[in-house]
Amino acid sequence: GAIWLTYYPHIMVEWYPHVLTVSTLYPMGVDKTMNMVEFYYPEEIAAFEREFVEAQQAAYMETAIEDDEIGERMDAGRRALLARGDNQVGPYQSPMEDGMQHFHEWYRARLGDAVPRG
């Protein structure tokens, strides 16, 4: 498991067992973004567990490729909306983020009156 923290709008910190990962998004243009990923390991792992480091980074990159596909598909959808003069600002982009919307609705319902509705 991991603990994720997003420092809106462009930095994500992911804390996994034995590694801290920082992803920073840099807009390069209206249709291009660079994702700089940095990995931080405890000294003993960085020095003596090279196979672990390589396996962990390979697993991370496999997930990053999936995330990249989602981003590219969402970008293509935004371009299609623009081309037909439509504007859907979100915050969720269906169908790719429907799960996130359902999760937030479920979570808000569990919080009840502790969180103001807006």
Predicted features along the sequence, with ranges:
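C-terminal catalytic domain of Rieske-type non-heme iron oxygenases
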Residues: G1-G118
